[in-house]
Amino acid sequence: MGLATALRPRDSRAVPRAALVQLRLAKEDFAFAAAHFTLFPDAAAERLHGHNYRVRVELSGAELDALGFLVPVAPVKARVRAICATLDERILIPEKSRLLELRQEPDAVQVSLGGRAYRFPKSEVSLLPLPNVTIEALAQYVWGELAPSLAASPVRRLRVEVEETSGQSAAFEADLTS
């Protein structure tokens, strides 16, 4: 008997049709250190400050391959690390904010809010397609960056959690199928 045969369930009725296998990945290097300020409706904002963010992902699906895997994890881990690298040691600026005035120069990004003005080196800024840099928005952003790499896989549902401090995190979870 081959390995693939040995790993198959003996009776397909043993696994309910609606059952999902969940694969959770939370590696030490699923992390990024970044600065931001949160904007508030009254045109106020926090001071510029930083966090050491941590990212966790959960993949859910019903079908395992012949060796009992939901999906090869190495490419998923590599993609999460790559997403984190684009945010690491950067100033996160929400480019879709109606509260900020942004001006891009060849070598700098200028940001104004009320009486505050910043000029950052362009290489140290990540302009994010978000209205605000919150952990909720970051979780949704990371989900959106990771999801396309899973489109051809048997993963049905993806959950991304972003933690900004111990005990304070947000998650975004959605189906991968339309």
What are these regions (language model features)?
Residues 3-178:
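Charge-rich, low-complexity N-terminal segments
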